[in-house]
Structure formats: structure tokens, C-alpha cells
Amino acid sequence: MTRKQRYEWMLDYFRKKMPEVQTELEFGSEFQLLVAVMLSAQCTDKRINQVTPELFRRFPDARSMAQVEADEVLEYIKSVSYPNAKADHLVKMARIVVERFGGEIPHDMDQLLTLPGVGRKTANVVQSVAFGKATLAVDTHVYRVSHRLGLVSEKDNTPYKVEMALTKYIPEEDIPRAHHWLLLHGRYVCTSRRPHCEKCGLNDVCPSAARQGISH
């Protein structure tokens, strides 16, 4: 099977299984999405969704968060990973959004990357989910699933290389959904330590499943 055929199989499977798919993070605005994504680094969406309702009631927008110190934000996010660093980044981000962008989250990738605590993965999520752009964020789930399914080569050994490889084969109209497809597949089926290959609808074409002697 060629790599192109593998992509076609994968895309056909997910289009049928998850035609409508979206982030599991809960938010009410572009600012709140950015905050939630920043908080989600090395933390589960479930945990973030437990924290953000109170956080967003207190800080619904960039202007309200920009007016306080990190210690006040910290009180709302103590249960997430690296709370001190994230609180610091959130306040600095909010202040820059207010000062440079009039309180609105910028659409431009380069401008997003100037915000404290915002890397390429976070910027891609915001561009895709908030602004509908054809960007594909590569987190640990997307990275793992892409390699296990043989969608990328061993040489694609960084998130950026995986992103470039995936977007080369995935049609532009499917790129926003593809991030969620691969992420959710990695979160619930192709898990890190004990992947559920026996119930995976892609095991017929998965090199990793084949090595374990598993297929339909």
C-alpha cells in the first residue's frame, strides 16, 4: 500500500466515523479558546473544563485579565499542570492582546506567536478552531498516531515535520477536522501505553497493528 492510499483509507474512515468533530475544550470566545488551549499543555481537556468556568466568570476577556497580577489568576488554575508558569503567561498574553491588538486575538500566525506562552501548536489550534483556517496542530496524540499508522516517515521526528508531512497529503478542506480525528483517535483508541488495536477500524492498514498480528 502506498502512502497516498494509506491516507485515502484513513480519511475515508474518519469522514464516515466522525463527520462532525470539534474540540472537547469548552469556551465562549476567541480569547477563552486561547486561554483554554494554553492551559491544556500537558493536561487533560477534562481537567481544563473543570477549571475554566470559574476562571472565565472572573476573567471573561483579555481586558479583565490584563488588569490583575498572575497570583490572582493562579488561584483559579492551581489544579492544572505548571500553574505558576501558566498564570504568568496568561496575564502577560492578555496585556499584550490589549496593548497591541485592541483586546482582540490576532488572526495572523506570526502575531499569535509573539504572545507569551503561545507556540506553534497552540497558534494552529486557535487558527483552525476560532478562525476556520487550514492549520493542523500536532500534539503528542497526533504525533503518535501519525507514526503508528505510517502516515509519516521515521525522518519526520519533530512536530513541525509531522505537520508538514500530514498537510502534504490531507486535502485542505479536511485539515481542520484531521487534527481532531487524529487527536481523538489517539486519546481514546490508539493510546500511548496500551493501544486498543483490536477495536480500531484502521488496523487492516496500520503497520503497528500488523506487527502485533492484529487485523479484522
Q: Predicted regions: what is each one?
A:
Residues T2-H216:
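Catalytic cores of DNA base-excision repair glycosylases
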